[in-house]
Curated annotation (Swiss-Prot):
Organism: Staphylococcus saprophyticus subsp. saprophyticus (strain ATCC 15305 / DSM 20229 / NCIMB 8711 / NCTC 7292 / S-41)
Subunit structure, interactors included: Monomer.
Keyword presence, Protein biosynthesis: yes
Protein name (database record): Translation initiation factor IF-3
GO MF: ribosome binding; translation initiation factor activity
Gene: infC
Keywords, in A-Z order: Cytoplasm, Initiation factor, Protein biosynthesis
Coiled-coil residue spans: none
Length: 175
């Protein structure tokens, strides 16, 4: 059977099925009717015949106001989009030998990202021989996580990836 696009619901004359399982406007089962009988019944009450389940045998149709139905669907879709929250991943780059004031500035930015609800990846890039002192970088990352523990949880512990060590922080959801 052919698939129907989301906004191409079969209504009234566009219905291709010869027989329909009809549901009345109040939700009561009317039974299996021909397409013409269903259209006549809907016309008598000034409503439309809308296919609800096109893949059923016979297809399930309902007598309703199609304009109102379409409006309700759009309203529900809009509401669902509002409820969805996109979570962005922000990255903060530090060095293993970062000074305290620079650290505080980066920390302030990281806290701002977390308070907005974004995830935060804090990374340290080791240059030259600094790679031999990974524990210094790990201490910096753990200090960062420690100072954000009131608003964030550690999603991923400090981990090496090539010449870079990183930690993932995600915001604590208030409910």
């Amino acid at each position: 059977m052919s698939t129907i696009a989301k906004d191409q619901t079969q209504v009234n004359e566009k219905i291709r099925a010869k027989e329909l399982r009809l549901i009345g406007q109040d939700g009561e089962q009317i039974g299996v009717k021909t397409k013409n009988e269903a259209l006549e019944m809907a016309e008598r009450v000034g409503l439309d015949v809308v296919i609800m389940a096109p893949n059923a045998k016979p297809p399930v149709a309902r007598i309703m106001d199609y304009g109102k139905y379409k409006f309700e669907q759009q309203k529900k879709e809009k509401e669902m989009k509002k409820k969805q929250k996109t979570i962005n991943l922000k990255e903060i780059r530090l060095s293993p030998t970062i000074e305290e004031h620079d650290f505080q500035t980066k920390l302030k930015n990281g806290r701002k990202f977390l308070e907005k609800g974004d995830k935060c990846k804090v990374s340290i890039r080791f240059r030259g021989r600094a790679i031999t002192h990974k524990e210094i970088g790990q201490r910096v990352l753990e200090k960062f996580a420690e100072q954000c523990k009131d608003i964030a949880t550690v999603e991923q512990r400090p981990k090496m990836d090539g010449r870079q060590m990183f930690i993932m922080l995600s915001p604590i959801n208030e409910k």
